[in-house]
Amino acid sequence: LAGMEAAKESGTKDLGKLVSELCGAPKDSVARRGCLLVEEALGNPAFEDLDWIVLTQKAREHGDAGVRAEAARCLGLLDPQLALPVVRQMASKDSSSRVRRAALLAALTLAPPTEEEDCSWALERFGAEESPEVRKALAVALGRHDLALIEKVAKALAVACEDSDWKVAACAAVSLGLTRCDLAPVTLSRLLQTSADWRLRGAAVVGLTKALHPDGLPPIIAALADSEPLVARTAHGYLSSLRPADAPGPDPEVWSQWWQETGSKRPLRDAKAQRERNRKYGYSTSHETIFRGMDVLVLESRGDHIQTVLERLAINHRLTSGAKVPESGLDAGGVFVSNCTGEMEPADIERLDWFVHVGGYLFGSCWALTETIQRLAPGIVGKLPTTGEVMNRVLASPCHKNSPYLEGVFGAGVQPIYSLVGSHLIEVQQPERVEVLVDSVQCAQDHGDGNLACWFQLGHGTIMDSANHFDVQGLTEATHLDKAEDRMAYAMDHMGASFALIRETAKEKFWGSNHRAAQEVFDDSVLRLLSNFVRLRR
C-alpha cells in the first residue's frame, strides 16, 4: 500500500521499478510483496501500460519455492494471452511440486478446460505429473460436467480411481461422479463393491451421489450396510436428502422398497427445486434454516463450546470426543467442528482426512489449528510463534470486503472484538493457497501478526480456522462496562445490535450485568462466518 501511494505521486515508472526490486529481494517475505503490489495495482488505469510479466520475472526465478508459487498465483490474475504460456511452462517445468500446483491452478483459471485445446493440456498434465499433491489438485479441477472432451476426462478419472495414493484416488472418484458421464455409475459401483479400503468405498458413495444417475441409487442403498460407520452414514445422509420429510432409518430393505415403488420415478435433479434452494439459502436466511437437515458433528473439548451456541439457535447437532470419531461416523455432506483444544487420536484424524478430501467442511477454533488442522494439512497454516500466551481482546477487520464469506459478519459501522483466550494465532505458511478473511492491526502490533480467521481448500473440501473461541464473543468477556448504557453502546458498536433491539429492551434488568446481558444479546459474527460457508455450499 505504501508503494502504491508513492507511485501515485512519483509516477508509473517508479512502481514498476519497485515491483521488480521487491520480486528480486533475497528474503522471501519481501519478494512476495512484489507480487502483492502487482495485485493491488491491477485495474488501476494509471498502471495499465506496465509489463507485469517482465516485472515479476525475478519472482518466477527466485530461489524460494514460496515466492515462485506466489508469482504463479499472481500470473493467474493477468491477461490470459500474455500470462498463459508462462504459467503453463511453470506448471510443467518447475522443480517444486508446490510451484507446479500453484501454476496449474493459475493456468486453469486463465483457460478453464471447457475448450478442447485447454482440456487436452490439462489431461496431458494429469498423465505426466509425478507429484500426488499436484495430481490431486488436477483430479479436483476436472470434476465438472461442462468440460470439453468430457468422455476422455471421465476415462482419465476412472483410471485415477486406482491411483497408488488414496487421496488422489478418492478425489478422482468424487470428480468422476461430478462429470455425470455414464461411465461414472459403472466405475464407482464396482469400486464400492470390490474395494477393501473404506476410504475408497466412501469416496465411491460420494461420487455416486454427485453423478445424479438412477443406476447409482441401488449401490448407495447397499452401502447402508457397510461395516465402516463413515460410509454408511454418508449413504444415509444422501438418501435422507431425497425424502427429508419422512426419511426412515438406515435399513437397506426399507430404502430398497421405497426406491422400487416411488424413488425411481422421481428426478434426481430438478431445476425448479434448485431455484427454490437458491432462494431458501439466501444471505438473510436464519442460522437454523441454513443448517437444517445437515449433519453437524461437534468435538467436545476442554476449551471452546460451540455446542452452547448451536443449542441457543436450535441448530441440530451431534457430539463426539477424542478417540470416538470413527464410531460416531461422518457424513461427507456435513460439517465437523473442532472445538479448542481439538485434541484427537490418530484414528480420528484419519477419518477427518478422508472427510475433508471428499468434500466435507471442517471448522476449527483456537488450539484446533495445531491439534486438528495442522495434523490434517501440515505446512499450509500453523501456530504463530509468540513470546507468551496470547490473552487479549482485539478489534477485528475484514480483509476482503467483497468476499461472500463475510456477508453479514461486519455490519455497517460495526467492528467486532475478538476475545483471544490463550489463542493459537494463525501463521499462513503457503499464502498462495490460503485466504485470510479477518485480521487485526491491534493484534499484529501486540503479537507480531494479525490473522484471525482464514480458509483453504483441501481436496474437494474446505477447512476454516478462527483464532478465537466461538462461545466467548460479545459481552461475555467485555471489560470496563460499568453502566447499562455502556453495555448497550457496546452491543451496538461491536455486536451489531440494532436500534430497534435497544429500544425494545432498554428497560430490561439484564443490562445491569455483563453475564445476564450476554445471555440475552448474542454476538453471532463468528457463527455467521461459518453459516456463510454452509449457505454457499448448499
Residue ranges and their predicted role:
Residues 294-376:
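Helical hinge/lid and interdomain linker segments adjacent to catalytic or ligand-binding clefts
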Residues 1, 28-32, 65-66, 96-98, ...:
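Alpha-helix N-cap/helix-start positions at coil->helix boundaries
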Residues 233, 237, 248-295, 299-300, ...:
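Hydrophobic targeting/anchoring helices
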Residues 3, 34-35, 71, 103, ...:
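Conserved hydrophobic register position within alpha-solenoid helical repeats
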Residues 343-418:
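A glycine-rich, often tryptophan-bearing local segment used as a flexible ligand/cofactor-contacting loop or short
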Residues 6-9, 37-41, 74-77, 106-109, ...:
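Core register positions within helices of long alpha-helical scaffolds
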Residues 12-24, 45-59, 80-92, 112-127, ...:
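Amphipathic alpha-helical scaffolding segments comprising HEAT/armadillo-like alpha-solenoid repeats
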Residues 272-294, 446-450, 458-538:
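Extracellular ligand-binding/catalytic regions of CAZymes and related secreted enzymes
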